[in-house]
Amino acid sequence: MNIHEYQAKEILRKYGVPTSTGLVVTKTEKINETIDKLNTEVYVVKAQIHAGGRGKAGGVKVVKSKEEAKKVAHDMFGINLVTHQTGPQGQKVNRLYIESGCEILKEYYFSIVFDRSASCITFIASTEGGVDIEEVAEKTPEKIIKFSVDPATGLQDFHMRGIAYELGFKDNQAKQMKEIVKSVYNAFIETDAAQIEINPLIVNSDGNLLALDAKITFDDNGLLRHPNITAMRDHDEEDPLETRAANAGLSYVKMDGNIGCMVNGAGLAMATMDIIKLYGASPANFLDVGGGADRERVKEALKIILSDKAVQGILVNIFGGIMRCDIIAEGIIAAAKDIGIKVPLVVRLAGTNVEKGKEILSNSGLEIIPAHDLADAANKIVEAIR
């Protein structure tokens, strides 16, 4: 789960991380009133969307008067902001964060993530802040530093000293950096975060370190333990089909293709998406119904797939282990009778009760195209939509 910048800063401040502060606006009629509450020489108006690249896309504006700030805020609120992370459709700006500006002497990048390949927690930092870290990694990889923390032993003093040293901090700034490292680590562990990113972490005119922008992504599996964090969820920032799928216990990610996919198991789902591309089409989604899906969940999965107007055909690929093929077949028939399936449908079944499942489908009277293996299924669905 993602949250907005102002929410991320609120969490980080609770853990002792110094951040820039401001006020959030959720209604246009509150813009002028909110800006009047800020007494500052410089105003920073920031669009609040769950995507990076806001600055380059015009979603962050710095102005030097209240009147300018009000005009910029009114112009920005409600626009469709397109960044390199939103895709061409963009994201509507329903919230603004208005801050007091400050002088920036130096910008740094600082984050903490799970490194699955090394089975550890990793700090990533760079003296090149304020830009995409991917760009730094590509052009000047030597400027990226990493420190890995063994979860069994936790954060140690040498980690904090090492990060401060590698970033070039000395004396009081080194002490500040060590405290920030410790605070961010504690926030990461205690909130079940998947990533915390501060970009940029700046040195201001007083020589102090300050988190000027912040992003936190949480592990969905840990949200049950954090109702206060779950309450920060902004459904307007999420695809409504993905929200609907999550409520139904389905793993669904919308994509830009034209072939809807319903599969059991994440690995098989990714293989199915790959082979669709191999045969010349593109997947419209990732959808894993899971191993314990019942008839109603299968039915809801197909409804979600068909709610995407870009879907021109559907490929169902089920390997029945825990999942029974006859349950899948019954769910397909129920969905077809309930909402109608007007696009080509290819079904490949294998595993538990496969013959019973095939029999149910063949006796249904529906126009279902059977496939005997994955390659055959991909070939048939691609040919069917041409």
Curated annotation (Swiss-Prot):
Protein EC: 6.2.1.5
Gene Ontology cellular-component annotations: cytosol; succinate-CoA ligase complex
Cofactor(s) the protein requires to work: Mg(2+)
Residues the record lists as binding Mg(2+): 199, 213
GO terms under biological process: succinyl-CoA metabolic process; tricarboxylic acid cycle
Keywords for this protein: ATP-binding, Ligase, Magnesium, Metal-binding, Nucleotide-binding, Tricarboxylic acid cycle
InterPro entries membership: ATP-grasp, ATP-grasp_succ-CoA_synth-type, ATP_grasp_subdomain_1, Succ-CoA_synthase_bsu_CS, SUCC_ACL_C, Succ_CoA_ligase-like_bsu, Succinyl-CoA_synth-like
Catalytic activity field: succinate + ATP + CoA = succinyl-CoA + ADP + phosphate; GTP + succinate + CoA = succinyl-CoA + GDP + phosphate
Sequence positions that bind substrate: 264, 321-323
Pathway(s) it belongs to: Carbohydrate metabolism; tricarboxylic acid cycle; succinate from succinyl-CoA (ligase route): step 1/1
Residues covered by the ATP-grasp domain: 9-244
Bound cofactor: record note: Binds 1 Mg(2+) ion per subunit.
Root EC class: ligase
Family per similarity comment: Belongs to the succinate/malate CoA ligase beta subunit family.
Function statement: Succinyl-CoA synthetase functions in the citric acid cycle (TCA), coupling the hydrolysis of succinyl-CoA to the synthesis of either ATP or GTP and thus represents the only step of substrate-level phosphorylation in the TCA. The beta subunit provides nucleotide specificity of the enzyme and binds the substrate succinate, while the binding sites for coenzyme A and phosphate are found in the alpha subunit.
Name of the protein described by the UniProt record: Succinate--CoA ligase [ADP-forming] subunit beta
